[in-house]
Regions:
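Active-site glycine-centered loops adjacent to acidic/histidine catalytic or metal-binding residues
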Residues: 108, 168, 207
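Short, Gly/Ser/Thr-enriched beta-strand-loop segments that form substrate-interacting elements
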Residues: 179-187
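Active-site-proximal beta-strand elements of phosphoester/diester hydrolases
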Residues: 201-205
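A glycine-rich beta-turn/hairpin centered on an aromatic-Pro dipeptide
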Residues: 165-169, 173
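Active-site loop->helix "elbow" adjoining a glycine-rich segment at hydrolase catalytic centers
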Residues: 109-111, 118
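N-terminal beta1-alpha1 cap of cysteine-dependent amidohydrolase-like domains
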Residues: 1-105, 116-117, 123, 127-141, ...
Length: 254
């Protein structure tokens, strides 16, 4: 880890919300670790939590259970666990983050949810559709991903071809409004999306939190934290507006 930011001081007052399930997993702890490595404080947001999003400087939508297909006009086609309460929470968080122009990073389910939020849809099971890629899950970066060089992700990864892991069985199908595809795998399944205007918004289909030993995947978090800091500085000069979702962010919600 030649670019290790271990010694980087914490950004004063920079708080990133991490939306996740009721119980944190290793993935969520690694996301927390990655954000703290780059100086951010974190607040874990469970389904149904009341959070004043205006007190956050950035939002991460983490991985987890499948988004209920009713969110994109379909009925369940696979046997899966759903968390409708979390779906509802993520809609509220994304809506308010969009209003406030707060940077958002979606990981796996989070990337899919961003696409659904923007009116897109999912393929509920890509496994039988794979031709040039492996069917089994890959925790190590053994999946080839092609990145659009002229994109935010391309700037972060610094290479048009990267290795990534794969722990998903669904994929983005119809692309949501004002989004662009910035990475695909060898079967052309979407691996990353970005906003085409305004708000810093990125969705990553793989799990970079498991690949922090790799500089490129680590930079995804550092660029996100930098975007949150930049937006915070701008917001300090803006008038404060109360939102309908205003609740609280615990001072020690790590």
């Amino acid at each position: 880890m030649s670019e290790s930011p271990v010694d980087k001081p914490e950004h004063p007052g920079l708080t990133i919300g991490i939306s996740g399930p009721a119980r944190r997993s290793l993935a969520h702890r690694l996301i927390t670790f990655a954000l703290r490595l780059h100086g951010a404080r974190t607040h874990f947001i469970r389904p149904g939590s009341k959070v004043d999003v205006s007190l956050l400087d950035g939002l991460v939508l983490s991985g987890g259970t499948h988004v209920h297909p009713s969110r994109y006009g379909q009925t369940p086609q696979v046997t899966a666990r759903y968390d409708v309460r979390r779906d509802e929470t993520d809609v509220r968080l994304l809506s308010r983050a969009e209003e406030l122009n707060i940077p958002v990073l979606g990981i796996c389910r989070g990337a899919q949810f961003i696409n659904i939020f923007r009116g897109g849809s999912l393929c509920q099971n890509v496994t039988p559709l794979r031709v040039n890629t492996r069917h089994r899950p890959l925790l190590l970066p053994l999946q080839t991903v092609r990145v659009v060089s002229d994109s935010r992700l391309g700037e972060v990864m610094r290479s048009p071809v990267i290795g990534a892991n794969r722990i998903h069985s669904q994929s983005i199908k119809k692309l949501g409004t004002h989004l662009r595809v910035v990475a695909v795998d060898n079967d052309s399944f979407v691996q990353a999306i970005e906003n085409t205007r305004g708000q810093w918004l990125m969705g990553i289909q793989w799990h970079p939190e498991y690949l922090l030993y790799h500089g490129g995947h680590r930079r995804i978090f550092s660029h996100f934290v930098q975007a949150a800091e930049d937006r915070k500085l701008v917001r300090l000069d803006e008038p404060v507006e109360a939102g309908e979702d205003d609740g609280y962010v615990a001072q020690n919600g790590r």
